[in-house]
Amino acid sequence: MKTFAPSYLKHQFLIAMPHMADPNFAHTLTYIVEHNANGAMGLVINRPQELNLADILEQLRPNEQPPASTLQVPIYQGGPVQTDRGFVLHSDECSFQATVALEGLSLTTSQDVLLAIAAGVGPKKSLITLGYAGWEAGQLEAELADNAWLNCPFDPEIIFGLASDQRLGAAAASLGINLSLLTSQAGHA
């Protein structure tokens, strides 16, 4: 008898289906950082907050004036879990105190990456989030079976080359899908 290994979605995008009712994830595009038998972790990459890197640096170093360039670096709502914790997805040409290498991408959670970005010596491409999306064991698989999400291959151009309001549509288009034409009804064979 053949056994099947589970299929995990690490290093892929999750596209929220148009009927997603959870306000934390409606109309979101999420990069999956980790997915295994214990659960999944991802970062929502298309929800900018009304914060920028200057705001964060003012909290970290209240006695120092952040560089003017940091006013142009948006902070994204990465998900509803630990919303006071920062996560930086970035190109992999440099690493920092708390950097995890992903496939052609890195994730850093230490403050030194923020200071490097502010000083103009950080990674060439980056996206900063507060919070993350987390799923318990089997939860994401159940949501996929309920047609809450579509998954598609990761494309760094979608994260780093497009405006936040274009990312969700671009990810769907990479599958040949127009989200506005989808229905909430689905069949299972």
Curated annotation (Swiss-Prot):
List, alphabetically, the GO terms of the cellular component aspect. Answer: cytosol
Q: Which Gene3D superfamilies does the UniProt entry name for this protein?
A: VC0467-like (3.40.1740.10)
Tell me the InterPro entries matching this sequence: AlgH-like (IPR003774)
Lineage, top-rank taxon, reads Bacteria
What family does this chain come from, according to its entry?
Belongs to the UPF0301 (AlgH) family.
- The protein here is known as UPF0301 protein PSEEN5058
Natural source organism: Pseudomonas entomophila (strain L48)
